[in-house]
Amino acid sequence: MRLALYEPDIPQNTGALLRLAACFGIGVDLIEPTGFLLDDRRLKRAALDYADLVDITRHSSWAQFCAARDPDSRLIVMTTTGTTPLHRFDFAATDTILLGRESAGVPEAVHAAADARLVIPLQSGARSLNVALAGAIALFEALRQVGRLPGGLPAR
């Protein structure tokens, strides 16, 4: 299981997602360009010291990400225009969950490359969740389904 971030533009959300990945023990694919420098203090503040615990693979473009991707890994795009509710999808341990830009989601080429396009059901009138929250919900559900949730309690 991996988390892919498509051209993220808010460093605090990227930092929160890196921390999430560290806590769940999964790798992150960072598809550039980003809307910030990777040494941005806001990213570091949100990630704390967890970013050092994450296997981060940087890709200079969408094309480079596609070329480097494991061909056995399904690409699962989280989108407000998804056709399958998150909780009705059967995840596999090798899936890559892709989150789009906070400001614009992902372009049509990314939608076209997806093996599945999932949506998190929301109350009527609600447009979307913060990308870090959506990532946390999606990743938890995926790891729960495949039996890969960490077994330990948080350190005290």
Summary of predicted features, one role per range:
Residues 1-156:
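Post-transcriptional modification and biogenesis factors for structured RNAs
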